[in-house]
């Protein structure tokens, strides 16, 4: 991995894999003077490298990862499968969600058992480019899966395949279980670490399924939060004097109906020759009542308004007498 100092590819100006990027995503070091030497030895010991969603366009600079068995490169901008012969021990490779158009350069990975190429741009299926060691393969989201007898052709070409596009190859699971039972009876020594590979892959597939469900749940949660914000913004209280959209008639609450103008005018204590009749209405509610069209017509009877001048004249005559 010497010479990989910049994340920019020299040919196309794209983003490629570098020591710095691998270290940033997969390693943590205390600050000291021997950091570069420690980083070199630690990179050599890495077995799992995660470089998903980094905008990577080119696969390169993996020569220093001698013990690598799991490589996560999903969600990048990779267009070509290349430069993987330097990691022959690779068993797990995720290239989902890239821009890959054809399957190539995978025969240099004799130990590859899990390959995820879902959500790419693969149109033509080249079955002779897949390693025979594959146990789990995912090509969903590519147009090549629409060709006739796609599933049958892939299963026939890969004799060890146990799962295709998230669907188990049932006949092989059943036959393998029977073979495993008979093998344990005839050769009990083979039930140890030699046959532990399938259990590892089951756990690996379950972990990927959990990650998928977690991402879907997170996206759903964000969507629901956005939906909850919308009614909060639209159901804000109206400003005084502003009617609701689509409401042509003024609405009167029970509290407003009790504090109407006729009660204050017809009350003997409120009537006076010097002061105009008024009602005790809160300032905000008063603006709302008088700002709406037709409030006075609907809440103040004409007879009660007309009685106010006559009451004043009667009081004036009595004072003269």
Curated annotation (Swiss-Prot):
It is found in: Cell projection, Cilium, Flagellum. LRR repeats lie at residues 45-66, 67-88, 89-110, 111-132. Residues 235-321 are annotated as: Disordered. Its main location: other. GO terms for cellular component: sperm midpiece. The modification Phosphoserine is found at residues 175, 182. One of its GO terms (biological process) is sperm mitochondrial sheath assembly. InterPro entries: Cilia_flagella_integrity, Leu-rich_rpt, Leu-rich_rpt_typical-subtyp, LRR_dom_sf. This is Leucine-rich repeat-containing protein 46. It comes from Macaca fascicularis (Crab-eating macaque).
